[in-house]
């Protein structure tokens, strides 16, 4: 395997040379014997900031590939007492050894095992699950492997089922009814969290989001794990519901059950999806710490993008409602000229943009107030 050295953050690692695995002038990371995707640098950059605040004694990257994620945590975030890197691909495990040595890390433990098998053998304060596709096969094992109110970080790249395009796949993987709705970019994340909560409950544990976001073609989610059947029951009863959207007028709201419910505005039957999580997507105290800290990482290649994302999330996080997609709402209302988002925000007064969609707004003001602004500004 021919290797190429690349720099990401403050580390230098060897990866399979893309030139050796191109097909008709194109390259996909999955074609190489060991997976490395430079497009996920933004994901890893933000994760470096998160781990720097958590300072876990034990870090476990269960699906390490080249080892880039765990190595960056150790070099840039926090020199943990123990760094555990694993990949079931023997070629990847060998490459991890090279990259660990290349970055002067002496206390790393490298495994060549199935991720689930390893997670049932050892415990960790911070576990990273960054698979190719869905994280569902690793939810139970990773939640079970946490200690001391540990953290599990999940990446999900299978947006088709989560956003309602592949309804059968969503039912199979996430045990949720789903449709493509106006706010599906956010609802997909909520379906993912809901699935994790239900899986954790079977272990008499529960999870709460610490920080989460959507970017490019994936969701990234950090959850804190708590033990106790009562806590699991309380979280399910309080934060797992369904979501309804009116296909005629665009009104949307959380609903208690998956049953025929009529829109209170126009009387049309709701399209209902779920179950899904209805609580906050971020821990506000932790979010504030991220905002206070991220400037220390101005060397990151995606620093400006991180700054922009955190600024938007800081503003939208205070609102409890799912965002409204103004473009799709205007289409349902047959408003041909969509008003500028900034003008709608000014009209509403108490509202913000959302990082989920460029034409989305988040506010706890009522549907009628939003419609008034949209129509008055056209």
Swiss-Prot record:
Its EC number is 2.1.1.216. Keywords: Metal-binding, Methyltransferase, RNA-binding, S-adenosyl-L-methionine, Transferase, tRNA processing, tRNA-binding, Zinc. One of its GO terms (molecular function) is tRNA binding. It catalyses: guanosine(26) in tRNA + 2 S-adenosyl-L-methionine = N(2)-dimethylguanosine(26) in tRNA + 2 S-adenosyl-L-homocysteine + 2 H(+). It comes from the Archaea. It is an enzyme of class 2 (transferase). Zn(2+) binds at residues 246, 249, 263, 266. Residues 4-374 form the Trm1 methyltransferase domain. S-adenosyl-L-methionine binds at residues 44, 69, 87, 114-115. GO terms for biological process: tRNA N2-guanine methylation. It holds the Pfam family TRM. InterPro entries: SAM-dependent_MTases_sf, Trm1, TRM1_arc_bac, tRNA_met_Trm1_C. Belongs to the class I-like SAM-binding methyltransferase superfamily. Trm1 family. Dimethylates a single guanine residue at position 26 of a number of tRNAs using S-adenosyl-L-methionine as donor of the methyl groups. This is tRNA (guanine(26)-N(2))-dimethyltransferase.
């Amino acid at each position: 395997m021919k290797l190429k050295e690349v720099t990401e953050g403050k580390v230098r690692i060897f990866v399979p040379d893309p030139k050796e695995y191109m097909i008709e002038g194109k390259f996909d990371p999955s074609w190489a014997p060991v997976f490395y995707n430079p497009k996920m640098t933004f994901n890893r950059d933000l994760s470096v900031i998160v781990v720097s605040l958590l300072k876990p004694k034990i870090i476990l990257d269960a699906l390490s590939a080249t080892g880039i994620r765990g190595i960056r945590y150790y070099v840039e975030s926090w020199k943990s007492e123990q760094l555990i890197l694993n990949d079931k691909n023997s070629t990847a495990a060998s490459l991890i050894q090279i990259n660990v040595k290349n970055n002067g890390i002496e206390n790393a433990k490298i495994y060549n095992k199935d991720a689930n098998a390893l997670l049932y053998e050892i415990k960790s304060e911070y576990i990273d699950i960054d698979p190719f596709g869905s994280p569902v096969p690793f939810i139970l094992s990773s939640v079970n492997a946490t200690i001391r109110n540990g953290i599990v970080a999940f990446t999900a790249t299978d947006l088709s089922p989560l956003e309602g395009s592949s309804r059968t796949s969503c039912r199979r993987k996430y045990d949720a009814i789903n449709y493509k709705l106006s706010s599906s970019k956010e609802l997909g994340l909520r379906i993912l969290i809901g699935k994790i909560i239900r899986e954790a409950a079977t272990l008499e544990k529960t999870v709460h989001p610490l920080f989460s976001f959507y970017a490019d073609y994936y969701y990234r989610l950090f959850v804190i794990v708590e033990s106790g059947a009562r806590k699991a029951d309380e979280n399910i009863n309080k934060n797992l519901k369904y979501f309804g959207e009116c296909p005629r007028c665009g009104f949307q709201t959380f609903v208690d059950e998956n049953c025929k419910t009529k829109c209170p505005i126009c009387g049309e039957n709701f399209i209902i999806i779920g179950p899904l999580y209805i609580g906050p997507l971020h821990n506000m105290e932790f979010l504030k710490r991220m905002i206070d800290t991220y400037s220390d990482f101005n060397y990151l290649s995606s620093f400006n993008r991180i700054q922009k994302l955190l600024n938007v999330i800081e503003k939208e996080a205070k609102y409890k409602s799912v965002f409204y997609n103004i473009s799709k709402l205007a289409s349902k209302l047959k408003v041909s000229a969509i008003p500028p988002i900034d003008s709608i925000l000014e009209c509403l007064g108490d509202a913000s943009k959302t990082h989920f969609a460029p034409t989305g707004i988040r506010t706890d003001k009522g549907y009628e107030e939003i419609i008034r602004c949209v129509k008055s500004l056209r």
